[in-house]
Each structure stands twice: as structure tokens, then as C-alpha cells.
A protein has these predicted regions:
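N-terminal intrinsically disordered, cationic/polar leader segments
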Residues: 1-52, 59-63, 106-142
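A generic alpha-helix surface/boundary motif
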Residues: 6, 79-80, 100
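Conserved interaction-surface patches within small, structured recognition/assembly domains
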Residues: 58-77, 86-90
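Generic hydrophobic/packing signal
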Residues: 73, 89-90, 101, 113, ...
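Feature captures hydrophobic
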Residues: 74, 84-87, 109, 121
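Glycine-rich phosphate/pyrophosphate-binding loops
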Residues: 91-106
Length: 142
């Protein structure tokens, strides 16, 4: 069974404390697909993150293309947060990505209260980068 955001909600509810949840987040990061070494460059780096974070986007065809994201970080917990963002956004159409309320997901997981301000800002930077990628290719509203 593949992990979904609903699975993460359920698993977080089951785990007793934040030490266990952080271990779970690290495990999610360890499950990321290997990130291409050639994409560990300035063009793919997410600015606004204290840790090194890289994000690579593949765009499908059409008016509302599917965007596939791959990401990585040099920090264990941040790599886990990258994994959560990949589960939330990757493999969706641009218009679907723009409709996702990532802040609400973070609140439901309790991350808004348990991340350092630096990690929370980095997470927002990653979400903004993903949203910017989707905005570039999403069909115009109207």
C-alpha cells in the first residue's frame, strides 16, 4: 500500500508524541526516490530554506498538465517534509495543485506548532515554489 496524505494523518494520530512523529517524518524522507545529482544545482535549489533543498519539476503535456516533483534535502527532518510535499502535490494537474491548502494540511498534522520558525519558513518557500510552477502552466481562470 502506498502512503497518502490520509495515511499520514492516521499515522500521526496513532503516534503518541512528537519524538515518534519526527522519526516517522525522517522515515518518510528516507523513502524518497533518489534525487538526480545533476539537479543539485542553483537552478533547482529552493531559496528561503536554511537547509539545502532542491526541487525538480517535470511537466506533462496539455492545457492543464500534470506536474511531477522530485525533491531532496541535506537535513533529515526537512527531507521528510519534502516527502510530505511530494505526496501532497506530485502527480496532480496544475489546477489541482493550486486548489490545495497546504497550510491547512500542516495545521491538521500539527506541524505549524512543532516546527522551528526556520523550518516553517522553508516549508512555505517550498510550497510557494510548487505553486509558482503550477501557476506558470495552469489554464487561465474565467
Amino acid at each position: 500500500m502506498s502512503t497518502t496524505i490520509d495515511t499520514i494523518y492516521d499515522d500521526f494520530a496513532f503516534l503518541d508524541d512528537w519524538e515518534e512523529r519526527y522519526r516517522y517524518i525522517i522515515d518518510l524522507g528516507n523513502g524518497l526516490e533518489p534525487y538526480p545529482e545533476a539537479a543539485r544545482d542553483e537552478a533547482h535549489r529552493v531559496r528561503g530554506c536554511v537547509s539545502q533543498v532542491w526541487l525538480h519539476t517535470e511537466r506533462g503535456d496539455g492545457d492543464d498538465p500534470v506536474l511531477t516533483f522530485r525533491g531532496d534535502s541535506d537535513a533529515h527532518i526537512v527531507r521528510g517534509l519534502v516527502a510530505i510535499m511530494m505526496l501532497l502535490f506530485s502527480g496532480r494537474r496544475a489546477s489541482e495543485i493550486l486548489a490545495i491548502d497546504a497550510e491547512n494540511v500542516m495545521r491538521k498534522l500539527g506541524l505549524d506548532e512543532h516546527l522551528t520558525p526556520q523550518r516553517a519558513n522553508g516549508l512555505r518557500s517550498m510550497v510557494q515554489r510548487i505553486r509558482n510552477e503550477a501557476t506558470e502552466v495552469a489554464p487561465a481562470a474565467g
